Amino acid sequence: SRGNIMPGECENKNHEALKVFQQLLLNYKGDQLEAVTQLQIGEIYRELGQFDNALLAFQEIIEKHQESIYIDETLYFSAEILNKKLNKPEEAKAFYEKIIFNHQDSIYFTDSREKYRILRGDITL
């Protein structure tokens, strides 16, 4: 049945999806699809625990697609990886700060502000 997933099956599907997205990226470089494709690549790397690769994919969006509708999401995911997975709170703080000052309408705004304040030492949990 479809509900029974074998060990490693999800990881294999992630690797397959990664290949597809990387091919899309080659075919549509500079296109509007580039930002969302990079976001998907970053997400897959994040799921696979390849956090440095995820950050590289997200950095592409941050550098080349500042006006993308995915920029706040990209900044937030970058901050979360740096804060929770790589234990780099100072670097994470910079990404949370960008959301706070530049993306007040983001769904990540409130959470980013709270985490920024914690990292800055204003509040403790």
Residue ranges and their predicted role:
Residues 1-125:
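Acidic, polar-rich low-complexity tracts and alpha-helical solenoid repeat scaffolds
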